[in-house]
Amino acid sequence: MQHNQLLEQLYSGHSLSTSESTALFNAVIQGELSNEQIAAMLIALKVRGANTEEITGAVAASLQNAKVFPRPDYPFADIVGTGGDGQNTINISTASAIVAASMGAKVAKHGNRSVSSKSGASDVLTALGVNVNVTLEQARQALDEIGVCFLFAQQYHSGFRHVAPVRAALKTHTIFNILGPLINPARPTYHLLGVYAPELVKTYAETAVALEHQHSFVVHGSGLDEVALHGETQVAEIKNGKIEYFTLTPEDFGLKTQSLESLRGGEPQENTQYLTALLQGKGKAEHANAVAANTALLLKLFGYDDLKQNVQNVLAHLVSGKAFETLQKLTTY
């Protein structure tokens, strides 16, 4: 009966503690709630707005029930956005992960099929020839050997299948849209997390503290769940339990403002062509700049503090074609 009491608590507008949220989401992930109960719970949370404790509990339950990834002892990062910003851009964080890895960083990218865009991380990687359904061991091997691996959310969080039909029927943002970036089964040392709404920056930052993230950035870039070059980027930096909020502009990266329109993507096949050209050093300048800015902030987590220098290094590195070599290696796993 405990589930019913917790559900009743939500229906009456009351918040759940972290442990209560963990218990309720455990029940969801283990298939103990009906579709109707899941739908009611998701809407109750949406109408009131899930708080830090509730999100932290949902993350805890998700990780407790996920397949266990053999976590390496070296530092590694994830760069991932919530999706759902509705902007249909090229796959900036996917490209940034590959570029950073080709420059010596280690990145275990967590991702899924498209939420709202035409082409999610796994859609475009599949189109590029990457096997997104590799085993845990193969993913870990790729991370060790070439510095990057892709962890396909559906493979690691099989309990989410109980929620899938409800989410599809509701056709609206729910708490599950904001869980994705926080539930990487490899539990990375560092995170660059993009959120689709500015008000989520604070919520996410506080959740990252509750989850004891070592060093993370949460970003919202003028309507994008990435660092923006068409406007300002709101940033929360989480380090050793402390949060610092600040704003980044294109000038902070040594770049000029460019239009959001210049980053529009399309179907996976079209995005694949853009990304292939970019990683070969033959892409559009606007694409290269956007990936350079996001990779620059990602590299800051690894101790490369000068964003302008990072951008210059990334742009020079792209021309070498080494990032494309890393992608080609990734397709062999």
From Swiss-Prot:
Mg(2+) 2 binds at D225, E226. The keyword Methyltransferase does not apply. Keywords: Amino-acid biosynthesis, Aromatic amino acid biosynthesis, Glycosyltransferase, Magnesium, Metal-binding, Transferase, Tryptophan biosynthesis. Mg(2+) 1 binds at S93, E226. Its EC number is 2.4.2.18. 5-phospho-alpha-D-ribose 1-diphosphate binds at residues 81, 84-85, 89, 91-94, 109-117, 121. GO terms for biological process: L-tryptophan biosynthetic process. Anthranilate 2 binds at R167. It is an enzyme of class 2 (transferase). InterPro entries: Anthranilate_Pribosyl_Tfrase (IPR005940), Glycosyl_Trfase_fam3 (IPR000312), Glycosyl_Trfase_fam3_N_dom (IPR017459), Glycosyl_Trfase_fam3_N_dom_sf (IPR036320), Nuc_phospho_transferase (IPR035902). Its cofactor is Mg(2+). NCBIfam families: trpD (TIGR01245). Belongs to the anthranilate phosphoribosyltransferase family. Homodimer. HAMAP family: TrpD (MF_00211). Catalyzes the transfer of the phosphoribosyl group of 5-phosphorylribose-1-pyrophosphate (PRPP) to anthranilate to yield N-(5'-phosphoribosyl)-anthranilate (PRA). This is Anthranilate phosphoribosyltransferase. It comes from Haemophilus influenzae (strain PittEE). The lineage of its organism: Bacteria, Pseudomonadati, Pseudomonadota, Gammaproteobacteria, Pasteurellales. The gene is trpD.
